[in-house]
Regions:
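Glycine-centered hinge/linker elements that transmit conformational signals in sensory
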Residues: 200-203, 240-244, 254-288, 319, ...
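Hinge/lid segment of periplasmic solute-binding proteins
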Residues: 111-165, 174, 197, 221-223, ...
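Conserved N-terminal structural module of periplasmic/extracytoplasmic solute-binding proteins
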Residues: 2-5, 11-13, 25-120, 131-138, ...
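Short, solvent-exposed loop/beta-turn-alpha elements that line the ligand-binding surface or hinge
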Residues: 127-140, 182-191, 220-223, 228, ...
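Short helix-initiation/N-cap motifs at beta->coil->alpha
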Residues: 86-95, 191-198, 285-300
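Extracytoplasmic/periplasmic substrate-recognition and gating elements
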Residues: 81, 279-280, 318-381
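Long, aromatic- and glycine/proline-rich binding clefts that accommodate carbohydrate-like moieties
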Residues: 326, 375-433, 437, 464
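Extracytoplasmic/periplasmic solute-binding protein
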Residues: 151-160, 164, 191-259
């Protein structure tokens, strides 16, 4: 099902009535005709449709907030009539694909980097709109602007950012009588540099079987693990994500834009992940995870000591009562890499009203109420203190080291692990299949598997677009 919210007003009316109705996917009527400017010659407001469902924004607690904000926008902007269409996330991509040829919306989002790249050829270049609207680029870090550059087009404005860092279960550290991991870049752990090898050694001490033996013990039973020292959850089986977390920035696409590759640091990172599951047993396999949490939310079980996940994960850890966050370690390339998720909204180039659509986009990206509802760290720097203050109130009495989040923003993966690829949809699916194989199959020659995957990806890249 999808949900469309329209705010109806009569001409000259100050108030607005809200009507919500449900309709089956694919049965929407045509969008109302709109004039090519933000104020029609007839005095009628320009119609703009905002399509939500390709990322966050569909949770039950988020929808009323989005509805209220759209109603407020329409009250404050008599020249634009904004319609909010909310589609279940499981159906949104297919629903939009069916609409694109004849009845596309104007604005899509929130949508992540991976999703936005899939629409790259159909997105409006925002460069001129950004300049004409006087958007202050200095309020957002340069590295975040670069994320939304595609083939010379600025396809989005940084809106919501979600750096990755380590969430850790303080109770499990206390049980093991181990110090907590560092919350400052450059800080050592027990006299050792904070590297992935240090994390591995720590995770071995935190991984415990049902008899209480840690993974360093000769009596450790990997068939009956009770607590795992490490995880990197919610990656959509994407081996590019695992390679980036443990290996650093890289790209599956060569500099020529058409050659498939797997950089050496990515190979090292993926080997770390694979060995962590099948050799060291410090990371849960797919079968082990399914046994404790079929939905994949491993940290929330209380049985994961350290978990690499993003800022948005504050949505989903009610099951752990005492936790904090730590900085990521340096990788095999000698640098820290915080795998970045980022949401924005984009304008489809089929819009008949680009000026009005950009006015809406600019309102969405700066709306603190929406950003808080989405659990989104604002890309605009001066909005962040209020965001973290709200989180402190939410998680009282915990005193979370939120400075970690802003520190990790300084180490994004550039290029993004979710960046554009030739034949994006097919290549993305192949990556997921490869990731699933690694997650479920022991005893593989990983480097040979990577070679075979690169060969497969090259074949996909070479297919006519």
């Amino acid at each position: 099902m999808h949900r469309r919210i329209r705010t109806h007003r009569s001409l000259g009316a100050i108030g607005a009535g809200l009507m919500i109705f449900l309709a089956a996917c694919g049965t929407q009527g045509s969008s109302p005709e709109a004039s090519p400017s933000a104020s029609s010659g007839t005095g009628e407001p320009v119609e703009i449709e905002w399509y939500v469902g390709l990322g966050t924004g569909t949770n039950p607690e988020q929808i009323p907030i989005e509805e209220e904000q759209v109603e407020a926008f329409n009250t404050d902007h008599p020249n634009i009539h904004l319609t909010l269409t909310i589609v279940d996330s499981e159906e949104a991509e297919g629903n939009l694909a069916r609409r694109m040829p004849t009845n596309p919306p104007d604005i899509i989002g929130p949508i992540g980097i991976r999703g936005l790249q899939g629409f790259g050829d159909t997105l409006l270049d925002l460069t001129e709109s950004i300049e004409s609207a006087g958007v202050d680029r200095s309020t957002i870090e340069d590295a975040l602007w670069d994320v939304y550059q595609l083939d010379g087009k600025q396809i989005g404005i940084p809106m919501a950012v979600y750096p990755a860092f380590i969430y850790y279960n303080k109770a499990l550290f206390d049980e093991a009588d181990l110090p907590y991991p560092p919350d400052e870049v450059g800080e050592q752990y027990e006299g050792a540099d904070w590297t992935w090898e240090t994390v591995r050694e720590l995770a071995l001490q935190l991984t415990v079987d049902s008899s209480g033996n840690d993974a360093n013990s000769p009596d450790f039973d990997p068939a009956s693990i009770d607590v795992w020292g490490l995880d990197a959850q919610f990656t959509n089986n994407d081996p590019r994500a695992w390679s980036t977390i443990f290996g650093g920035s890289g790209s599956i696409v060569g500099d020529d834009g058409s050659t498939a590759q797997w950089p050496d640091n990515w190979r090292d990172g993926l080997q770390f992940f694979y060995d962590g599951m099948w050799t060291d047993h410090i990371i849960p396999t797919k079968a082990e995870l399914d046994a404790i949490e079929p939905d994949g939310n491993s940290f929330n079980t209380g049985r994961i000591a350290m978990d690499v996940v993003h800022q948005w994960y504050t949505c989903c850890l009610a099951g752990v009562s005492d936790w904090d966050v730590a900085v990521l370690p340096t990788g095999p390339d000698g640098t820290i890499t915080s795998k970045l998720h980022a949401d924005t909204v984009g304008i489809l180039d089929t819009t008949e009203n680009p000026e009005a659509a950009f006015e809406v986009l600019n309102w969405i990206r700066q709306n603190p109420t929406l950003l808080q509802a989405w659990g989104a760290l604002p890309a605009v720097v001066d909005q962040r203190d209020a965001f973290f203050a709200a989180l402190d109130e939410q998680f009282t009495p915990l005193e979370v080291a939120w400075s970690v989040s802003t520190l990790m923003l300084g180490y994004p993966d550039v290029p993004s692990h979710e960046a554009s690829m030739p034949n994006f949809v097919e290549a993305n699916a192949a990556n997921g299949e490869f990731g699933s194989r690694l997650w479920t199959t022991p005893g593989l020659d990983l480097q040979a598997e990577v070679d075979a995957h690169v060969e497969r990806i090259q074949g996909i890249f070479d297919e006519p677009g």
